[in-house]
Amino acid sequence: MKWILLVFGSVCLLDVVEDSFVHGKRNARTVTFSRTGRGQSRRRRDTWTTEKERFTECNTPLSVKDRELLRSHTHETGFHGDDGSSFTLTWAGNGTGIIFVLSTISVPSDSFYEGGSSRLYRSEDYGKSFHDISHAINNTFLNSYFGISAGHGNPQPVILTANLPFTKDPGGKIFTSMDAGLTFRSVQLQFHPAQAIQFSLLDPKYLVVISIDDGLWLSEDFGNNWSKVHEGVHTFTWGSENTLFFSSSPNGTVEAARRGELILRRTCDFGKTFDTIAENIFSFGHIGSFLFTSVMEKLGSPRVIYVSKDQGDHFKRAQLPSATTEQFYSVLDADEDMIFMHVDNPGEDTYYGTVYASDEQGILYSKSLERHLFGGEGKSDFTNITSLRGVYLTNILEEGGCIRSVISFNRGGRWRYLKKPENVDCPDMSKKCNLHIHGEHSHFSGVTPMTPSSEPTAIGLVIGHGSVGDSISAARPDVYVSRDGGYTWWGTLRGPHHYSILDSGGLIVAVEARRDRGISSIKFSTDEGQCWKTFNFTDHPFFLAGLASEPSSSTMNISIFGYRLDDNHKPMWVAVTIDFEHLLTRECNDQDYVTWLAHSNYSSNPKTDGCLLGYKETFRRLKTLSACRNGRGYVVSRQQSPCICTSEDFMCDYGFYWHENSSACLPQPDFLNQTQDFCLNVDLQTTGYRRIPGDKCKGSFSPPRNEEAHQKLCGNVTSSDSHTEIPPAILALIVVCSLGIICLVIIAAYMITSRRINCGQRSPEYNFSVLQIQEDDLSVNNESTPNGKLNGFQVQEDSDDVSLIKQ
């Protein structure tokens, strides 16, 4: 059975886009588990359609010695008497072993209780034991959404935010700690925070937050004292160094209906002075080196994107299709060199759009992928495979309603279908047969418990849920793994699982995802998912909530959270932490590693084999059969060498698209009329190709030149390339006539100026109707582009991105 788009339901995309944009992505240091279901609209995990087995899972027995060794390093904690409906885990620092667990239970607002209740636990041994420290904060009820904020640095700063009834208390309360929670200091606030307190990236003593009345509050002494520096603030984000960007209403209050009139402001001295760098914006964001905005240049016109790469000093309009009120933009991914932008397809609830890739300035965009899936709930499957440079994975919606997976190995320059796993048979040989990977859509809908996973230190390793066939299937998904960044795949686990990459890829753990019964065992692999061993970690099964491990993939501890009935037949939270470090005791040596050329297709040309974006990368990676420990100090070893330029180093230029049948970049018909304004201001010389941003290739290779490309794109705007020769006699006559005209203009200007000086007291007469139209146009333009600058929108990021811009 095929999975079609109907599973997305009728969720309003714009509302979800708004929420995702304001609140940002899930903190990489924080994970939340819940005992409640994900909603009736989600798919139950016991209602999948069934299909025959496509592959056989490889399992090897666990020796008695290893089983006893793991059992002696398995630690179970039962949170007796805790009736919290959700558990939120937050790690303090990297490699510290310190974890905070916030248990909360909320009650309806009309209940006779005030708010709800919470408990705070702390572990300093990677979750092997937890201690209730609620008394350290006087058993104060903490906010269930942003109760814990952990900053970077040593000592580890931690801030707890209380959940006080704002109808009774004039201000909120926080608890601050500079010793990772050993001690806390209570601070009474003058305001109620509306979101999590944000730390400065340079100095954790500098804090910023928005209050429930839209005030922007700053602290320069780690929360002891606060100053309200601005009113009517909608959202904010930190820029480079101590730069803070925020959008605000010109009238001091934020109204959703007036979001097209927001002002973008900037402060570089923690609120002492402000610069207005843009006006009339809808939203803004900062990711990588780019600051960008969504703007309506004229009343009633579609919205457009403006981009700055100098922290807001100057903005330029991005050459992208405009978006109507039914459409939206979404920044899928960005770094220092490039932006991937999704532009929604025209029409209501189309659930797909086009992905564009920018140049290094973020101004010119090339069409990278059409019919890119973007569901009504505001979720995109666009995934950066962090274990191998230049690799991106996503899904497209074909015209028949089928969803298929595609992958790019050169930063969106070319896309292709995924290869069928070597150990998997095709269900129907008469149809297309490829691997299709479930993404965020499936995770949100309850089809899969996790999204694809990769880690920068686990070179080439990718693991995710998928199905094999002509499109994504509604059947029970299996787990597939790739060890070369997505070029080839292997069926590794039958059925859906929770999984985690540990020890920089030297260890993978997985727990079967079930809702119909409890779990008691964990699977682990030391050969990149080729085979698995099973360890029973408890004699008392419990219902799985999820896995949790330190944000760094170098850890060898995994915590399994769930719940079961206690002796009084009440739900009880359970945490089981397994330390695999005592199983893999041998440190890896030189003999355990092998040299591996990334992106190699084993071609006959050694000069170009493995070349990607202008250079090769050779890694020293762990051998598949080496059962040893990389360790916390493991650093990826790589060697880079330059490559000569080939066609793979180029992508289609602005206004062109890749035509599969001709294998060439051809002009986009729908862009011919949209480029005229740009051509008037920029000498857009193009052959239809441009080098991929960040590409470092060397050599004299040039893509095939299309002599008519520029003329088709800019029409008759450019005349510098004209080859029409003018006879010398006619040219001399033109020069003489031009000089004569210039002299006449100078004389006339002198006479008019003299007359105006003599008649300075006269009242001028104007054509008011014409003048008013001109002033209205100028007024809108001046507000949209003050002093040649323009506006920006927020991407809250803990690493990666990606966020949404409501249009």
Regions found by a protein language model. Give the residues of each.
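Extracellular glycan-interacting surfaces
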Residues: 2-807
